[in-house]
Structure formats: C-alpha cells, structure tokens
Amino acid sequence: VIKFIGNIYERLRKSPKRIVFPEGTEPRVQRAAARYVKLGLGTPVLLGDREEIESVAKREGVNLDHVGVIDPAHAEDLDLFCERLETLKRYRDLGPLGAKKLMIKPNYFGAMMVQYGHADGIVTGAGEEAANTLRPLLQLISPQPHLKSVSSCTALDLSNKRYGERGVMFFADCAVIPDPTVDQLADIAVETGVLYRTLTGMKPRIAMLSFTTHSNGSLAGPAKVAAATALARQRASQRGIEMEIDGEMQADTALLPELGAKKAPQSLVAGR
C-alpha cells in the first residue's frame, strides 16, 4: 500500500493540486482535507455554509488551517457560473433564478470549478447517492475530445501481493455504465489502462472478464466481450499505447497463474 500510494504522494508534492470537496460539512471529508494539507499534496477547498463547516470542525477537533472554504451561495464566481450554466443546451430554459438554485448546490458548483480550471479535481460521494454525485459531473465537465463515453474505475492495493502487479489492480466500470456496448467496453478498457500506467508507471495487462474463457463466440455475452477485446486492441494500437489486452476470460483465469496456464496458455494476461 505504501509504495503505490506513496508514489502518488511524491508526484503531488512535486506538482501540488487544488482539489474541491463538495461535502464540506462531513467530518470524514474535513479530516481528509486536513490530512491533504498535512501531507503537502496541495490545496483542498471545502464547499458549504462557512459557519456550519467551522462548527463541525470545532466539534470534531479538525484543524482547518490552510484549508479553503467556499460557500457557493455567496461565492464571487456564482454569477459567472450561472451565466455559463445557461449557455448549455440542457439548462438553457432554467432562467437566472433556476440557474442560481442549481448552482448553489455544492456538487454542481464543484463540477463547474473543475470545468473552468478553478480546481484540478473533485472528490465527492462520501455521503450521497451515486446518482446525485455523478449527474453534475457528467453534465458539466467536458470529457477529453477522443472519448465517446465516460466511465469509472476502482483501484485496489492488496496486502496479498500475489495478485495483480504486486497487489495493485484496477476494476472498471463499477459505477457509471451498467451494461456497456462493445464500443463502450473498448473505451473503458483502454482508458483504464491509460490511467493505470499514469498512476503506476507500469505496463497495463487488461483482462476482459466474462463467465467463459475464449469460448469462440458461442454465447452472446462472451461474444460481446471478445468483440470489445479486439476493438480495444485496435484503439490502443492506433493511439500508440502499449498494453496487453486479452479476453474474454473468467476472473480466476485472469488472477491465478495455475488456471491461466491451463485455460489460456498463450495469453500474456491470463494468470498475471
């Protein structure tokens, strides 16, 4: 755990980031922001009512020195963000009052901060339902030009270093697209691989999971995964991204060397 997270810490210390936390009154979020400062990783910004944030911090014994606090309802950028919101087709009919009512919600305000460079990133979802946190992010933050779909991934750093790359594995997509198409699945694979390399510096080995291993397209579900595997390889090659992609395969085949060698002996991914 120390090495994977420690490497990210070192990169942040060399290039500190301004991170916005919309759930500014949550004690757990406040402690995370305070630790972000203590570790020298950048500048955290809590969103919410200033008095309530300070009251919670005092009650919980959280030191908010060098932690920014912005109340969206009284922020200098509120009018600017409302104007920008009304330029978006989805929100064009809101009117000034409707735009303001939406923009004072911390997740919307935080998403707009990221979209227009007022923050480098956003950390949210500690206490709210996923839909309430994802909606403003997906609607207000523009994806990179080459992306057709936006997805999520979960990073695991296991104490058992037998699995993954010394215990480090990424799983996608676990939150945003419940039933991806072939096209979306290929995007998810490649972009997760890119993120993996960015955060670890290691070559990605991507297993496209299903309930069969190399079944030759006899079933619809595995056939979709196999087609996505081929498309993901093509897209990675076109962009000059070096990564190993194989599928479809079962999870145990991907993770366990003895099963990988038995079920997919030619694979550079199975069992690894």
Language-model-derived ranges and their functions:
Residues 1-227, 231-271:
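Anion-binding alpha/beta catalytic cores of soluble intermediary-metabolism enzymes, centered on
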